[in-house]
Amino acid sequence: MKRIVTEISNGVVIARNGEKHYILDPGVVVFEGNEIIFVGTAYNGGADESIDATGRIVMPGLINSHLHVTDTPFTQGFLEDIGDKGPARSATNLVSLYSVLPEVRHATDPDAQIAAAECAFAELARTGSTTVVDLGYDFEIGGNGYIAITERVADVAGRMGLRCYSGPRYRSRHYGLKPDRGVFYEDYPDKGRSRFEACVEFCKQWNGRYEGRLRTMLVPGQVDTCDAGLLKETRRIADELHLPIQLHAGQSPNEFRRVGVTESLTTVEYLDKCGLLGPDLIIGHGQVMSSDGDMNSMSAFEVAALR
């Protein structure tokens, strides 16, 4: 079957020569099927289709590497209205992280979560994201975070044509805000092991679907909600199945203190002790986690941090 050749011309092209990006204004990009065959200023070959990109930017797709598509369309407004505001309160992240987010998530039913995912994925595609990473929830969200919901969300991304990394979360315990503004932690009955097994099975069954556009990843919830055994088992499975890992860490001063009290270690030291540090680990947030030597450890292990 003949592959269609498409020429995009007259736009501002953000190109790359292998070492750095550069601008072509105007520029031309030509692709055949799913392969780019020309980037430059003038194309002399024939094309089956032409797109006039006058007044537009032609660029590689954006990578959005930390998303919660099933709840952000709901939680964003609440965070803006009643979340932590101002430098002092936002630095603690107490109300937003430990009260608003869990409560709003728990109030959403599975069908609403799918509608939110459809809305979020459509907005991402419309604004230039072609690769997205969605981090799901466990019992914190309505519907108890059943894997069937994760499967439905992954199917939405696959049918939309996005490249998607899907990671349902698991953890040993959950947290919340007490009336005195202290943070409580409560262990799950089985320390989250059954949820972990379900997430691993999802990763095995769904990795590589939709012509390879859907990938899976291991997502232990937060550094302060996962015991050492769960993190060590995460590393073992990641190595066995060659899966990436993303973990929430450095979200609040409370989290940093919690790890210090329970483990007598800094956040990074705890992750190192559990064997989690490595080039396949992405730390989400990472605002409150550093101590002398911690950044050097992350650099040595080629750990990525994003927010």
What kind of feature is each model-predicted range?
Residues 11, 29, 34, 55, ...:
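Divalent metal-coordination and catalytic microenvironments
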Residues 1-45, 56-58, 63:
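N-terminal metal-binding scaffold of metallo-dependent hydrolase/deaminase domains
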Residues 56-59, 67-82:
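N-terminal hydrophobic targeting/anchoring segments and the immediately downstream early-domain regions
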Residues 79-136, 140-163, 195-209:
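Alpha-helical scaffold segments that flank or form the walls of functional sites
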Residues 48-53:
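Short, well-ordered secondary-structure micro-motifs within conserved domains or adaptor modules
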